[in-house]
C-alpha cells in the first residue's frame, strides 16, 4: 500500500542519514588527526577573549584545557584578567541578571535585544557565557577547565574587538607573559608580543562576525603552538 511504501522510504532515509553522519564523523576525526600530527605537543592551553580558543581546540580535536571556551570578555576587562591571571582565576564566579551588567547598554546595541545567556562577575570583571545553557553548566565547566590549565605552556591570545586605540595594545604588550598573540585592525609593532594586523577586523568590529577564518589565514597556528616557550 501507499502507506507502507512511505514508511519504507522513511526507514531508508533514516538509515542514509545515520550513514552520512557516521561518514562525516570519521572524516572530521581523520582531519583532526592529520592536524594534530603537525604539532610537537598537545598539552598547551589557550587563554582567549572570545570563542577563538575553543575553535583551535576543535581544529585539532583536543580536550579543552582552558576555562575561556564558549564565552567572551570585553577588551578592557580581558586586559585586567590577563594582567592578573592567577588572581582572577582564584575568584569565584558570581552570576548576575544580564540587565545588571555594566556593559548592558553596549551589548543591547550590539544584539538589538536583551541577552539571555549567563553572565557572571569574576572580581570586578564580567564574563559572558554565550554558548552555555545555564549558570550551572557555565560554573561547572569553568571550574574543571581551570583545573586543566597548563600554566607552563600557555598562549595568551587577544583580538582587539571593542577598542580602537593603541593604548590597549601597549597594555597587552607589557603583560609579563612569554607567549602573547594579538590580532588588531591597527598597525602596531612591538618586540614584546606578536601583533598581527587583520584588516577584516575593521568591518567585523562594526557588523560583528567570526574572526577565526581571517586569523588562521594570517598566521600558521601550528607554528605558533610549536614555538610556545615554557613559562
Region spans (language model):
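Surface-exposed polar/charged interaction patches
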Residues: 6, 12-15, 29, 88, ...
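Exposed alpha-helical structural elements
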Residues: 8, 18, 77-80, 144, ...
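Short, surface-exposed, polar/charged, turn-prone segments marking secondary-structure boundaries
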Residues: 73-79, 182-187, 208-211
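Extended, basic/helix-rich recognition subdomains
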Residues: 145-195
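Membrane-proximal basic amphipathic "stem/tether" segments
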Residues: 1-41
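Positively charged, amphipathic N-terminal segments that serve as targeting/anchoring signals
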Residues: 33-35, 39-42, 48-154, 158, ...
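Polybasic, proline/glycine-rich intrinsically disordered low-complexity segments
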Residues: 186-231
